[in-house]
């Protein structure tokens, strides 16, 4: 797999002549399983084949159950300078419902260590979860803001057919999704993000003003998005950078 990605990096280089790479994003949920050496091989390939700006933002996507303290320390000693962590919720019942591998304690412990060794952290939070009320959503946001994360990607829960959660809802084990409740969660999110000093980049994507001021100069221009081996496409800041190199 790594050989194939490196090969495509080399083959696609001519498609981006004259462009500069400003952001490198290792996505897909589990790139944290790669060793520092394996990550560095791909980063070195990008530097060799593309024009990379000085001090680019290099993000690694990971789940809390993969980010032990030792692993976070290892990553802080690599070229990675930003973590994107799939927290989803700080409430155990929510995590169990969504069949997440981590629990609330692991989520908070992960962020505690991550904020000690990284100063640029993004987390995912999900709202509109069956049974979630404004109080628990407020508690989720309060916890995130208290950790001082400077980027939050927040999404309304969607339930795909033939999934375990879909079956549980059909059987009445969990209440169905409520669009009105999700709307209330979204409105509360907007209020809280303003109070916390975060700016809305796109609906549901919040960044600290310091990060926002860094990238706002390019908002509005059409940019290239390059996606390699992802199950889904990340659009975060896609209109604010020259090339958004995603691995």
Give residue ranges: language-model regions.
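C-terminal scaffold of the Radical SAM
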Residues: 1-15, 19-247
């Amino acid at each position: 797999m790594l050989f194939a990605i490196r090969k495509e990096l080399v083959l696609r280089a001519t498609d981006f002549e004259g462009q500069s790479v400003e952001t490198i994003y290792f996505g897909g949920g589990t790139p944290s399983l790669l060793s520092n050496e394996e990550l560095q091989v791909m980063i070195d390939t990008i530097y060799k084949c593309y024009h990379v700006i000085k001090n680019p933002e290099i993000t690694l996507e990971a789940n809390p159950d993969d980010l032990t303290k030792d692993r976070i320390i290892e990553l802080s000693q690599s070229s990675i300078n930003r973590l994107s962590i799939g927290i989803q919720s700080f409430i155990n019942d929510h995590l169990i419902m969504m069949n997440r591998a981590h629990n609330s304690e692991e989520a908070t412990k992960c962020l505690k260590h991550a904020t000690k060794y990284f100063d640029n952290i993004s987390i995912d939070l999900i709202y509109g979860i069956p049974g979630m009320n404004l109080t628990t959503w407020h508690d989720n946001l309060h916890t995130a803001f208290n950790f001082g994360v400077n980027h939050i990607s927040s999404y309304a829960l969607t339930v795909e057919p033939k999934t375990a959660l879909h079956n549980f809802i059909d059987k009445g084990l969990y209440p169905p999704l409520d669009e009105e409740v999700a709307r209330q969660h979204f409105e509360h999110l907007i209020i809280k993000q303003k109070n916390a000093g975060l700016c809305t980049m796109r609906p549901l994507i919040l960044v600290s003003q310091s990060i926002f001021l860094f990238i706002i100069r390019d908002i509005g221009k059409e940019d290239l998005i390059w996606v390699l081996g992802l199950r889904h496409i990340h659009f975060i800041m896609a209109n604010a950078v020259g090339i958004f190199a995603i691995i």
